């Protein structure tokens, strides 16, 4: 079992890094965990739609280069399916029962994910209709994956 969180951009703030490290340690009891960061594309503050698409394309190529062919890709998208914590646990459990064991959760940059990445996705997951900073989403995601494993194992975890 392997969980990869693949994200555009680098975690800079110490407090985000500490939170991630804590959940990596906790999750390590259930699964191999890997965090992969790909560089975000340098871009001006204001861009045309065409320029935004070009940025997404370049970031998308970097993301896709990190995904193995056998991986189950779960993209984080505003338009994705919203699940409860129990729902995420059930989704992962069903996929594991089907023999899937290499999960890659993909978090895009500030402009979102390129269509090529969306096309590679096996499941589109949404945490909210709201937009969150991608650094924060890494922490929220890894916590929810940890919570899902606790639920799957029937272990207590605070609510």
UniProtKB/Swiss-Prot annotation:
Gene3D superfamilies per UniProt: 3.40.1280.10
SUPFAM superfamilies in UniProt: alpha/beta knot (SSF75217)
Catalytic EC class: transferase
Compartment(s) of residence: Cytoplasm
A Gene Ontology molecular function term of the record: rRNA (pseudouridine-N3-)-methyltransferase activity
Residues noted as binding S-adenosyl-L-methionine in the record, renumbered to the chain: 76, 108, 127-132
A Gene Ontology term for the protein's cellular component: cytoplasm
Entry superkingdom: Bacteria
Pfam families named in the record: SPOUT_MTase
Main localisation: cytoplasm
Keyword field contains Oxidoreductase: no
Catalytic activity: pseudouridine(1915) in 23S rRNA + S-adenosyl-L-methionine = N(3)-methylpseudouridine(1915) in 23S rRNA + S-adenosyl-L-homocysteine + H(+)
UniProt keyword rRNA processing, yes or no: yes
HAMAP family for this protein: 23SrRNA_methyltr_H
Quaternary structure and partners: Homodimer.
Primary role: Specifically methylates the pseudouridine at position 1915 (m3Psi1915) in 23S rRNA.
Family: Belongs to the RNA methyltransferase RlmH family.
Name this polypeptide is given: Ribosomal RNA large subunit methyltransferase H
Species whose genome carries this gene: Staphylococcus hominis
Gene: rlmH
């Amino acid at each position: 079992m392997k969980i990869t969180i693949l994200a555009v951009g680098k975690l800079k703030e110490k407090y985000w890094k500490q939170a991630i490290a804590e959940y990596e340690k906790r999750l390590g009891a259930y699964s191999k965990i890997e965090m992969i960061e790909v560089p975000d594309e340098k871009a001006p503050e204001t861009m045309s739609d065409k320029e935004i698409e070009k940025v997404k394309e370049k970031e998308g190529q970097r993301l896709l280069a990190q995904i193995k062919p056998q991986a189950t890709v779960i993209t984080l998208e505003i338009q994705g399916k919203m699940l409860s914590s129990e729902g995420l646990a059930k989704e992962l459990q069903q996929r594991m029962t089907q023999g899937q064991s290499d999960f890659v959760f993909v978090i895009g940059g500030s402009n979102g994910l390129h269509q090529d990445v969306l096309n590679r996705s096996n499941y589109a997951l949404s945490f909210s209709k709201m937009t969150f900073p991608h650094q924060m989403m890494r922490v929220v995601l890894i916590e929810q994956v940890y919570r899902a494993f606790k639920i799957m194992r029937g272990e207590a975890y605070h609510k």
